[in-house]
A protein has these predicted regions:
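Gly/Pro-rich loop segments of beta-rich domains
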Residues: 1-24, 51-69, 98-129, 159-186
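Loop/turn-rich, solvent-exposed surfaces of beta-rich toroidal or solenoidal domains
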Residues: 131-153
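A short loop-to-beta-strand structural motif that recurs across blades of beta-propeller domains
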Residues: 1, 42-46, 88-91, 149-153, ...
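Conserved beta-propeller blade signature
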Residues: 33-36, 79-82, 140-142, 195-198
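Residue-level detector of Asp-centered blade-edge/turn motifs that repeat once per structural unit
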Residues: 27-31, 73-77, 135-138, 190-193
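Short loop/turn segments immediately following the C-termini of beta-strands
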Residues: 38-40, 85-86, 95, 146, ...
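Blade-level signature of beta-propeller repeat domains, shared across WD40, Kelch, NHL, RCC1
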Residues: 184-212
Length: 212
């Protein structure tokens, strides 16, 4: 990990995992607990510290291994959202910060192993290789869609819509969200003014989507 005080250059070790393909990382917004996922086994782990190997396995998503994941907590810290990239869906896992325990994972948006592009409510929506999401201050989730070159928006109630880009059209175009073009967006984050920053992977750029 790196720190702001160190100019994001003071790289330090935190956790050493014995298996390859460790993917997906989330920090609880209130407690600071750190969670990560391993692709080969499919388990979500909690890092307890202080030693490198102080971690514990917690649960799998859909009892599956070989899953490529990205994770984020909602702003309240009451749920962990797990994007299963190579299964084209998003799971919601309730979390109790007082007892430090998770509930049962439940499918929140998209369909397991059902790739496509469909807007709509929750499990009726379809994604194509969604990646690292982020929340705004209103509880909306923004999901970069690597396979369709778009940014999707999911409301707190699970309504999925197109936020920016044109489905299936890779490119580089600035402008209004519906006219913008991306090329395999990988990650998003939301700034304090609700501006959305996009890691536009195959354009080798960081893009900014502003709220007018």
């Amino acid at each position: 990990y790196v720190t702001r005080e160190g100019g994001f250059m003071d790289v330090k070790g935190l956790c050493k995992f014995e298996k390859a393909e460790t993917q997906g990382l989330a920090v609880h917004p209130q407690t600071g607990e750190i969670f990560f996922c391993n692709k080969s086994g499919g388990y979500i782990y909690r890092f307890n510290g202080p030693d490198y190997e102080d971690y514990e396995p917690l649960f799998q998503i859909n009892r599956a291994d070989k899953i490529d994941t990205r994770m984020v907590f909602n702003p309240e810290g009451t749920a962990l959202f797990v994007v299963v990239c190579n299964r084209h869906c998003i799971y919601k896992v309730p979390y109790n910060a007082l007892t430090h325990t998770f509930g049962e994972p439940e499918l929140f948006a998209g369909g397991w192993d059902e790739s496509g592009y469909v807007n709509g409510s929750g499990v009726t929506a379809r994604f194509d290789n969604p990646r690292q999401p982020a929340f705004d201050q209103d509880g909306n989730m923004f999901v970069p869609e690597y396979g369709r070159h778009t940014i999707r928006k999911i409301t707190p109630t699970g309504e999925v819509s197109l936020y920016a880009g044109l489905p299936g059209q890779a490119g580089f175009t600035d402008g209004l969200p519906e006219k913008a073009r991306f090329n395999k967006p990988e990650c998003v984050t939301v700034y304090l003014d609700n501006s959305l920053y996009v890691a536009d992977r195959d354009n080798h750029l960081i893009r900014r989507v502003t709220v007018e």
